[in-house]
């Protein structure tokens, strides 16, 4: 079984979040902001929390994957734009899973964490574009490729998740 959960970013520009669910494992691709909501919120509120962000619909509504939260094994980030990486400081902690991103995207994420005085328990791994690596599932390892692609920010990658059912490509 391969099930794709379109959590955010499919009916609007922003709040990008996709989850690929397999029998025993699941993987997050991007957790981003809806920027117009962030701008209006920053004009009113100085402190951002997940609850406030969800109230103004600035982050993905991940309640649709609450039943598979314990299956999340990794979080992959495709590039450094805020609509793909911006909500990680506020939402990633609830998933006991490491974060994988390119070095530039990791620097942007580190800045977001510092700006919001947030320390994540998740390990963050910088992976160079055009690199393959393995992530641990419940009973198997999965090969992942970070494939360099062209975009309006540096170190953008298409992510290839190799599963027993085939390769899932993510290039949102």
Where do the language-model regions lie?
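Active-site-proximal beta-strand elements of phosphoester/diester hydrolases
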Residues: 3-8, 27-30, 142-149, 167-172
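Divalent metal-coordination and catalytic microenvironments
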Residues: 4, 20, 30, 79-80, ...
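Pre-active-site segment of Zn-dependent metallo-hydrolases
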Residues: 15, 25-76, 90, 115-120
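Metal-dependent phosphodiesterase/nuclease catalytic metal-binding core
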Residues: 19-24, 28, 156-172
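A short helix->loop->beta-strand "cap" motif at the edges of active sites that frequently abuts
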Residues: 25-26, 95-97
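Conserved P-loop/Walker A NTP-binding site and adjacent catalytic elements of P-loop NTPases
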Residues: 32-39, 78, 102-103, 109-112, ...
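Di-metal (Zn2+ and/or Mg2+/Mn2+) metal-binding site signature of metallo-dependent hydrolases
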Residues: 69-95, 103
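Metallo-beta-lactamase
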Residues: 104-156, 162-164
């Amino acid at each position: 079984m391969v099930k794709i959960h379109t959590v955010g970013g499919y009916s609007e520009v922003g709040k990008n979040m996709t989850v690929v669910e397999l029998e025993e494992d699941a993987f997050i691709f991007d957790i981003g902001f809806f920027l117009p909501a962030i701008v209006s919120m920053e004009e009113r509120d100085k402190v951002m929390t997940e609850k406030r962000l969800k109230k103004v619909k600035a982050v993905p509504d991940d309640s649709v994957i609450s039943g598979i939260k314990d299956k999340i094994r990794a979080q992959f980030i495709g590039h450094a734009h805020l609509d793909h990486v911006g909500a990680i400081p506020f939402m990633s902690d609830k998933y006991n899973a490491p974060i994988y991103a390119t070095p530039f995207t990791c620097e942007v994420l580190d800045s977001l964490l510092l700006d919001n005085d947030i320390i994540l328990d998740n390990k963050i791994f910088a992976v160079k574009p055009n690199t393959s690596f393995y992530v641990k599932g419940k009973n198997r390892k999965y090969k992942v490729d970070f494939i360099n692609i062209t975009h309006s920010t540096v170190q953008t990658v298409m992510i290839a998740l190799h599963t027993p059912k085939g390769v899932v490509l993510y290039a949102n």
